[in-house]
């Protein structure tokens, strides 16, 4: 089993070569694909009229401040929009995929 992490910027422009590479790996061993999508979460949050909030740790790491409403938006975007689009692309390319 191998885990592959693709960032939100890759998700935004998922190239056919990336799908092909994932397919090749999946044919050899099981794959868990983890995706980002923070920019899309921010975009949808703003479209819904809510201002995104972020916090910065003492070491300089920026993180999204997630209240209940933001958590619901995050879930909607990540598992509803992004996850489903990735699964659809993988399945169109004969990769057996399910989104969780």
Predicted regions mapped to residue ranges:
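Nucleotide/pyrophosphate-binding catalytic subdomain
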Residues: 1-100
């Amino acid at each position: 089993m191998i885990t592959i992490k693709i960032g939100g910027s890759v998700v935004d422009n998922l190239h056919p070569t990336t799908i092909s590479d994932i397919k090749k790996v999946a044919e050899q061993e099981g794959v868990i694909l983890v995706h980002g999508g923070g920019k899309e979460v921010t975009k949808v949050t703003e479209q819904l009229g809510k201002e995104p909030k972020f916090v910065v740790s003492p070491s300089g790491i920026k993180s999204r401040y997630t209240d209940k409403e933001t958590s619901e938006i995050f879930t909607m975007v990540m598992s509803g929009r992004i996850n489903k689009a990735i699964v659809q692309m993988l399945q169109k390319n004969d990769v057996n995929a399910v989104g969780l």
